[in-house]
């Protein structure tokens, strides 16, 4: 037994929690102080092992004082073996100081802020403005402010403070592999030398020694002003005098068992050897008394500097990469820290773990939804720590006896031992080698093997969202030949798994607390609803859907014997009444697994039901995908997780048993359609083909009727409509009992589009969002004519898959398939990175117990989570009929007439408190709430053709009412008092049970008003479904029934609120990231505009990066009320918007020398140009006297283009003179244009007339100093940059569309109206505000930055939510508003726009470890050291790094236990003997007995 005590642990050791980690620069003195090498020179031997005794060389790079990594050696510093020695630092004393490459940029900035002569700050530190500037700033912010001030200083010139030396510009020079800091004066004494050439500024090389001397003289006060803490980080410590040698443990040398064999040293050890050799060479070179050339010392020093630089970072620009003898690039210190495989992300944030398994998954129809089948070989290797108690000692003793080989057994035993000194320890016994029995005692720990019922975490990578890791119960498979995990098919959707070779991971929790949390929180049976969409995520799949469809068809009859056999596989009770000796319907059989009391009604139309369930009995409807999802959703919200899981398990087992008996198959004959249908499809294709040809001919005859893009989109839509018609035709003509029809109709597999392509026609192939493009030689493929736009040439495939593809059709199909493969490959990398950025941005945001949402440092992100404080898993879609009701309907359906009130009072159904005035007041309130919600919807989407009636609610009162109405027995003789109903409605949304925000009713008036605003939608919903008239006349509630609804509401609303400690940021990041992975890479067509805008992944990246230059800037211009139906005004405004220069209308331009402008045979006479612009503007403006202007820029214009853009000669002359007069005010013009302007002395413009046959413009000018380049640049400037009309950045504005929108008349009726909307490409809201006719308050654009700059952060936040939602939905994705709102709040909570990338992360108030775990790991850690930052272990990343529990979820609170009360409650329980319950004979039992007797 002694041989088994090979490892041990201290049970009594306490693990302290890390409260704070402070960063500082490791000073040269500190390096010496912490070094294990006593010799002042440190490590001096560039050797590893002694060749004589194979021991580490004394004073070498693996000196035993630095630690040991071989088991037979002992550390000379701590005396421990390799197992216990932590390792110790050493040092190398450098002959010359060298730069630390990580701090070089900071040295540059610091030296730029101080005088290199007197070593003082360039700014006078006692000036008031300096003190005010840095008053509330620390660290980086303060240093940035000082740097910006010092950039403006030219001399160290403050009287009685500075020395008058010119300030210097510091730069880093890495030429020829050397590393220098260069200083050159920023102020030149002489601008030019005697020859007129620019005088070179003198440069000074700042060596590390000189920099060290300068920085050492900087005072502590100046350090503090610059943002440094001199107690932690003095600037001179950024220069290395003593080089720290890392312990051997982080760079172990590998040696074979034969001691004389060569070693394999770590890359860092190789670099240390190079550093020592270079340092010793430099020492010898400097120490030699002979005359030594300066270049030799410099070369040796630069080699030492290079080796030190590549030790820290071996991939710096400008420096050669360090290599070993075998040409392998050395892995530096920084490379070990950063990146996915680095120490931070690879070993601290995530790591390999014990007690985990991975193998392929296979489906198992008999395993429960929350179970996982575990192979026996895995169950015998994974263990759970079971503490021995008096209750389980016998059971665990038996497991220990079984050992590791006999299942179920145990693998290890940890015996609790107390030594003579009172120290507690645990001796570990490996049961594989035990040859004697082990006696267990209470307190011992047995690592037993997995058994049935153990809780594990099941995971499939990539873990994109919360449901990628869920808890399951083990079900051990007792067969050594079965080696895969067994999984229920229905649970694969959240994992995004299938059974084509997917592998999944299994993790075993190692404590009862962890297992309990997994069981109660992460259990698969409790994770039915997706937080991203609030919809059921775990659904019935494939065979279950198909079998349900077949079983519930109206004519399906099942033999009663089969029915009983089928139900035996479910959890249905044995006493269910199944009629014998007669067939039963499939609906009846299915009803047996539906919970009793469930009521659902979904209508297909006024006469037919799509689904009807009453009190758990399925009476109407054939169950497909949507119907079963509706059932699951209702069971989940009405009954809970247990019943929902039972329904899925029972449905799957029942349907599989049903299919085994009744069968299902798909064959080729299922896809065959009749000859008439084929002819119909052929005729339809021919009709569309001819329509396409006719449209092409029309466009060719008049190409100005629309743009090329609009033409292509119209053709594409016309041809795509063929597929819709064909798929509907094929589905209508399929045999309703064919396998393929059943598969598609049930939602089990495939879509109608697939059926249409299989049996009808493949249709239009789309590549890159368009028809097949004409590319090589004007053709799509060589067999088509040039520039052929017809259907077949551009990718329309008329054949079906049954008929087979032609050669060109096959090629087109392959093109589309190739695009899909490429998009998937690109999208995988992009979306993965987007999700990571989202997680790092939002990971610290959580719900606090005060109702607010805050980050790790307590900064407020949102006052209320998602604007309603409701957990997204606890909300359901509810329709509010009041929104669409007109005034008359509100009067009839929601409030009483006077006669009805009198009747209620007369029959004592209400007292006199419900008066006519109260009734009228209720009517006005309902109308007011309805109109307010309508106005809000109009403001949200001004051009929407529909309005929203369905909203997410935390309660489903309508379903609860439906359940009450469908009760068999109701006590509704006395209806509820309507006054009581109104009173309780007010109590429901104002009461403390439904309070969302935490506030004091007396003092928090503002919060109270916010609470009303937040619950406004809830208020409308309550009045809509519980209006007094509905309660008394429609539902006919008794008071007891109405009170049930009130109690249900209060209980549900309490449970629906988001819990304190919920990491809502993490959930939001995952809920947004997961649908982003489903988005496409392309743009989408904006209906009616003939244009495409960025959508999908491209737009998501723009929004998250807060891009200032978006790919498709669009402005949707709404006209003022009086012009919204005036197309002429809309066209006039649109024509003015487009930015137009002379280049847009020019045909030809020349520069001509014409010294005699008024000559009879001159240029002006020839061109008919005599219309001089005679508006006198002084010498700086356009001139009227052109005699002394010999140069002419002759511009010939296109008359057609001028007419198209509504431009005349007067506009050209006016705009030219305006541009010329303000030429010196344009700060955005190019430098070469400014030089041209300086050379042009005078300018004038002369034109012919609007009715001239060829419009010609002469721009005459003179120049004091010109050459050919000057003339060319002047021509380019006038033609390309001088604006004639329009608004800057607006590149197109001729898209005027007539859009429908929803409005309401005076009686509250919904009215569809139309208005003209201008779609402009480009954005410039500030200039648009100057144009009459544009309603700028309703005009919208898709540029978040522009909105922020014009309207502020709140407008930008709203616009971001709208644009981001549209970007996701453009590709069919969806994410709840709450998640996008959290993202928008995180981006805008600091008052500006914070991009979701590393630049945005640096702006956030986060701790160093949190920033380092994202990107630029080494740079972040170095910055933290420079500014002496502290990490207070508040962020998620920091706490994971140090192995601490995060401050979220179950880790954000503590449990207090009163031991005295527990002791007082302990009582001895007497042994209880349960009475024997006699078996009652049932039908099944009688059948079995009679069957036995008959035998």
UniProtKB/Swiss-Prot annotation:
Q: Which GO terms describe its biological process?
A: DNA-templated transcription
Q: Where in the cell is it found?
A: Virion
Q: What is this protein called?
A: DNA-directed RNA polymerase subunit 1
Which UniProt keyword terms apply here? DNA-directed RNA polymerase, Nucleotidyltransferase, Transcription, Transferase, Virion
Q: Which GO molecular function annotations are given, in alphabetical order?
A: DNA binding; DNA-directed RNA polymerase activity
Family statement drawn from the similarity comment of this UniProt entry = Belongs to the RNA polymerase beta' chain family.
Q: Which Pfam families match?
A: RNA_pol_Rpb1_1, RNA_pol_Rpb1_2, RNA_pol_Rpb1_3, RNA_pol_Rpb1_4, RNA_pol_Rpb1_5, RNA_pol_Rpb1_6, RNA_pol_Rpb1_7
PANTHER family reported for this sequence = DNA-DIRECTED RNA POLYMERASE (PTHR19376), DNA-DIRECTED RNA POLYMERASE II SUBUNIT RPB1 (PTHR19376:SF37)
Keyword Transcription found: yes
- Catalytic activity, EC: 2.7.7.6
Q: What does this protein do?
A: DNA-dependent RNA polymerase catalyzes the transcription of DNA into RNA using the four ribonucleoside triphosphates as substrates.
Reactions listed under catalytic activity: RNA(n) + a ribonucleoside 5'-triphosphate = RNA(n+1) + diphosphate
The reply to whether Repeat figures as a keyword in the UniProt entry is no
Source organism, top-level taxon: Viruses
Gene Ontology, cellular component aspect: DNA-directed RNA polymerase complex; virion component
């Amino acid at each position: 037994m002694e041989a088994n005590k090979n490892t041990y642990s201290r049970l009594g050791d306490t693990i302290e929690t890390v409260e704070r980690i402070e960063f500082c620069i490791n000073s040269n003195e500190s390096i010496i102080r912490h070094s294990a090498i006593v010799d002042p020179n440190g490590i001096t031997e560039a050797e590893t092992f002694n060749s004589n005794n194979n021991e580490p060389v004394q004073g070498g790079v693996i000196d035993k004082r630095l630690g040991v990594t071989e088991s037979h050696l002992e550390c000379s510093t701590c005396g421990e073996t390799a197992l216990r020695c932590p390792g110790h630092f050493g040092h190398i004393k450098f002959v010359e100081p060298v730069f630390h490459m990580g701090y070089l940029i900071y040295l540059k900035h610091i030296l730029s802020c101080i005088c290199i002569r007197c070593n003082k700050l360039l700014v006078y530190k006692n000036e008031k403005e300096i003190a005010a500037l840095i008053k509330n700033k620390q660290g980086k912010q303060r240093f940035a402010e000082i740097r910006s001030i010092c950039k403006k200083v030219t001399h160290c010139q403050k009287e009685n403070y500075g020395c008058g030396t010119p300030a210097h510009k510091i730069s880093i020079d890495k030429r020829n592999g050397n590393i220098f800091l260069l200083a050159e004066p920023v102020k030149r004494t002489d601008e030019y030398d005697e020859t007129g050439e620019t005088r070179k500024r003198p440069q000074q090389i700042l060596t590390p020694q000189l920099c060290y001397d300068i920085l050492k003289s900087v005072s502590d006060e100046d350090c503090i002003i610059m943002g440094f803490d001199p107690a932690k980080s003095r600037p001179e410590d950024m220069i290395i005098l003593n080089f720290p040698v890392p312990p051997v443990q982080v760079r172990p040398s590998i040696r074979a068992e034969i001691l004389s064999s060569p070693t394999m040293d770590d890359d860092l050890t190789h670099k240390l050897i190079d550093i020592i050799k270079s340092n010793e060479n430099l020492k010898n070179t400097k120490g030699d008394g002979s005359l030594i050339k300066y270049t030799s010392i410099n070369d040796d020093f630069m080699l030492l500097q290079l080796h030190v630089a590549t030790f820290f970072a071996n991939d710096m620009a400008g420096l050669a990469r360090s290599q070993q003898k075998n040409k392998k690039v050395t892995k530096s210190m920084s490379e070990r820290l950063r990146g996915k495989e680095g120490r931070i992300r690879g070993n601290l944030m995530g790591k390999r773990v014990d007690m985990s398994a991975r193998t392929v998954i296979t489906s198992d129809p008999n395993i429960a939804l929350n179970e996982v089948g575990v192979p026996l070989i895995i169950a015998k290797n994974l263990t759970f720590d079971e503490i021995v108690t008096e209750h389980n000692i016998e059971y665990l003793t038996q497991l220990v006896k079984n050992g590791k080989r006999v299942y179920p057994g145990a693998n290890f035993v940890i015996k609790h031992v107390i030594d003579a000194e009172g120290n507690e320890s645990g001796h570990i016994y490996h049961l594989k080698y035990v040859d004697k029995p082990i006696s267990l005692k209470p307190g011992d720990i047995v690592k037993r093997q997995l058994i049935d019922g153990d809780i594990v975490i099941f995971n499939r990578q990539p873990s994109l969202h919360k449901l990628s890791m869920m808890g399951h119960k083990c079900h051990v498979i007792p067969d050594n030949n079965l080696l895969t995990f067994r999984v229920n098919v229905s649970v694969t959707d959240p994992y995004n798994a299938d059974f084509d070779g997917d592998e999944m991971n299994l993790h075993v929790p190692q404590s009862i607390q962890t297992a309990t949390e997994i069981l109660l929180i992460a259990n698969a049976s409790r994770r039915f609803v997706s937080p991203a969409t609030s919809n059921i995520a775990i659904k019935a799949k494939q065979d279950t859907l198909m079998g349900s469809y077949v079983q519930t068809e109206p004519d399906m009859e099942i033999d009663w014997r089969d029915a009983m056999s089928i139900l035996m596989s479910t959890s249905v009770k044995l006493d269910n009444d199944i009629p014998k000796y007669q067939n039963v319907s499939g609906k009846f059989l299915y009803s047996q697994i539906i919970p009793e009391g469930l009521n659902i009604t979904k209508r297909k139309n006024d006469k037919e039901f799509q689904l009807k369930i009453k009190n758990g009995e399925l009476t109407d409807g054939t169950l497909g995908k949507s119907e079963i999802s509706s059932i699951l959703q209702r069971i989940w919200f009405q009954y809970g997780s247990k019943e929902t899981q039972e329904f899925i398990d029972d449905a799957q087992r029942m349907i599989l048993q049903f299919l085994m008996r009744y069968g299902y198959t798909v064959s080729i004959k299922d896809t065959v359609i009749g000859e008439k249908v084929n002819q119909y499809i052929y005729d339809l294709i021919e009709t569309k083909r001819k329509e396409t040809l006719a449209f092409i001919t029309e466009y060719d005859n008049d190409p100005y009727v629309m743009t090329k893009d609009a033409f292509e989109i119209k053709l594409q839509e016309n041809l795509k409509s063929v597929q819709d018609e064909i798929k509907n035709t094929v589905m209508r003509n399929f045999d309703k009992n064919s396998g393929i029809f059943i598969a598609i109709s049930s939602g089990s597999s495939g879509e109608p589009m697939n059926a249409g392509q299989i049996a009808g026609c493949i249709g239009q192939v789309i590549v890159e969002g368009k028809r097949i493009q004409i590319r090589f030689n004007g053709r799509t493929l060589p067999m088509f004519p040039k520039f052929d736009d017809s259907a077949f040439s551009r990718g329309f495939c008329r054949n079906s898959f049954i008929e087979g593809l032609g050669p060109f059709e096959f090629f087109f199909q392959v093109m589309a398939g190739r695009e899909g493969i490429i998009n998937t490959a690109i999208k995988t990398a992009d979306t993965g990175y987007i999700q990571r950025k989202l997680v790092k941005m939002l990971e610290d945001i959580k719900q606090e117990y005060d109702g607010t949402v805050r980050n790790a440092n307590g900064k407020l992100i949102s006052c209320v989570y998602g604007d309603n404080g409701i957990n997204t898993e606890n909300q359901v879609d509810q329709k509010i009929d009041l929104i669409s009701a007109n005034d008359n309907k509100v009067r009839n359906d929601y409030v009483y007439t006077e006669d009805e009130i009198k009747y209620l009072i007369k029959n004592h159904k209400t007292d006199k408190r419900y008066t006519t005035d109260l009734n009228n007041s209720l009517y006005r309130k309902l109308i007011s709430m309805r109109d307010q919600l309508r106005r809000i919807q109009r403001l949200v989407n001004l051009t929407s053709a529909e309005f929203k009636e369905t909203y997410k609610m935390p309660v489903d009162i309508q379903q609860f009412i439906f359940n009450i109405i469908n009760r068999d027995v109701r006590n509704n003789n006395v209806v509820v008092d309507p006054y009581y109903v109104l009173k309780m409605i007010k109590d429901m949304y104002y009461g403390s049970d439904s309070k969302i925000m935490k506030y004091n009713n007396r003092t928090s008036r503002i919060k109270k008003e916010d609470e009303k605003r937040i619950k406004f939608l809830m208020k409308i919903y309550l009045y809509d479904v519980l209006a007094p008239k509905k309660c008394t006349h429609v539902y006919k509630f008794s008071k007891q029934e109405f009170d049930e609804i009130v109690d249900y509401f209060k209980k549900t609303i309490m449970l629906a609120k988001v819990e304190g400690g919920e990491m809502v940021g993490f959930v939001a990041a995952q809920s947004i990231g997961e649908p982003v992975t489903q988005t496409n890479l392309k743009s989408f067509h904006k209906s009616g505009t003939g244009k495409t805008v960025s959508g999908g992944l491209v737009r998501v990246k723009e929004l998250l990066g807060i891009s200032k230059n978006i790919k498709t800037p669009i402005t949707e211009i709404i006209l003022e009320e009086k012009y919204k139906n005036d197309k002429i005004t809309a066209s006039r405004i649109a024509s003015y918007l487009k930015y137009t220069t002379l280049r847009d209308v020019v045909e030809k331009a020349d520069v001509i020398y014409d010294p005699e402008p008024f000559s009879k045979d001159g240029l002006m006479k020839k061109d008919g140009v005599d219309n001089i612009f005679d508006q006198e503007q002084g010498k700086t403006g356009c001139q009227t006297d052109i005699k002394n202007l010999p140069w002419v820029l002759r511009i010939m214009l296109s008359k057609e283009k001028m007419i198209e853009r509504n431009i005349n000669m007067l506009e050209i002359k006016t705009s030219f003179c305006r541009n010329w007069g303000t030429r010196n005010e344009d700060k955005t013009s190019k430098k070469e244009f400014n030089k041209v302007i300086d050379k042009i002395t005078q300018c004038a413009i002369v034109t012919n007339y609007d009715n001239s046959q060829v419009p010609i413009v002469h721009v005459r000018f003179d120049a004091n100093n010109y050459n050919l380049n000057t003339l060319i640049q002047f021509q380019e400037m006038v033609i390309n940059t001088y604006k004639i009309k329009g608004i800057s950045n607006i590149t197109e504005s001729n898209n005027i569309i007539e859009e429908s929108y929803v409005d309401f008349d005076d009686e509250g009726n919904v009215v569809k109206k139309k208005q003209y909307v201008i779609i402009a490409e480009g954005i410039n809201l500030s200039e648009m505000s100057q144009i009459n006719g544009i309603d700028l308050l309703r005009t919208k654009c898709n540029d978040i930055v522009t909105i922020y700059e014009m309207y502020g952060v709140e407008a930008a936040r709203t616009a971001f939510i709208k644009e981001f939602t549209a970007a996701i939905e453009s590709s069919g994705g969806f994410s709840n508003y709450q998640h996008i709102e959290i993202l928008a709040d995180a981006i805008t909570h600091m008052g500006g726009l914070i991009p979701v990338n590393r630049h945005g992360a640096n702006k956030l108030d986060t701790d160093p470890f949190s920033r380092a775990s994202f990107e630029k790991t080494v740079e972040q850690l170095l910055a933290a050291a420079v500014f002496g930052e502290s990490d207070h272990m508040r962020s998620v990343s920091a706490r994971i790094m140090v192995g601490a529990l995060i401050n979220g979820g179950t880790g954000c609170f503590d449990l207090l236990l009163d031991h005295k009360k527990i002791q007082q409650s302990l009582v001895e329980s007497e042994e209880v003997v349960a009475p024997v319950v006699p078996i009652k004979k049932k039908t099944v039992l009688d059948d079995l007995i009679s069957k036995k007797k008959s035998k």
